[in-house]
Amino acid sequence: MDGVICDFVGRYKKLFNVNPDQTRNKKEFGNLFNQFIQGQNFATLEMMPHAGELLEFLRNAPVPTEILSSTARQDSHENISKQKEIWLNSHGITFKRNFVPGKQLKKEYAKEDTLIIDDTETVITDWRIAGGHAIWHRDVPNTLAMLKLYF
């Protein structure tokens, strides 16, 4: 979800005046991320540019589509899952939802007949190693072009 259909980075930068990648390896990120969660921000993120086009393509795809999204860690899993459910519902997105307490767990869903769209290179690498197909999302036009090669 984050970085593909909803804009976590944009909201984080707006709230804290810093890119999350600049704080991820610092104690500062944990404190700011906790504030982000407590502010219910995952429920109200802006949609990524052109995400509607991607969602429409996936709604019409000849295969089942599911959401696979990380809740960052176990202690925030329930809270972030609820916020992401609210976001999906408010945008009329009815795909089956799967939430995992850490992006490193996404690979557990990889199978030979699965395809993930994700904006994180490590997720893409892990998914492919686990046997699934993957599209490293950079923007909607490129992702749509890649999807059309599969369908």
Per-region residue spans from a language model:
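Substrate-recognition "cap/lid" segment bordering the active-site pocket of phosphatases
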Residues: 70-114, 121-124
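Hydrophobic/aromatic residues located in beta-strands of well-ordered beta-sheets
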Residues: 65-67, 97, 134
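Acidic, Mg2+-coordinating phosphoryl-transfer loop and its flanking beta/alpha structural elements
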Residues: 115-147
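Short phosphate-binding/catalytic loops that engage adenosine nucleotides
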Residues: 63, 93, 132
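A short acidic, amphipathic alpha-helical/loop segment
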Residues: 50-57, 109, 123-130
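Active-site neighborhood of HAD-like aspartate-dependent phosphohydrolases
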Residues: 1-38, 129
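Substrate-recognition element of Asp-dependent hydrolases with the DxDx(T/V) motif
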Residues: 43-46, 51-82, 88
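A short, conserved beta-to-alpha structural element at the edge of catalytic cores
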Residues: 21, 27-34, 135-151
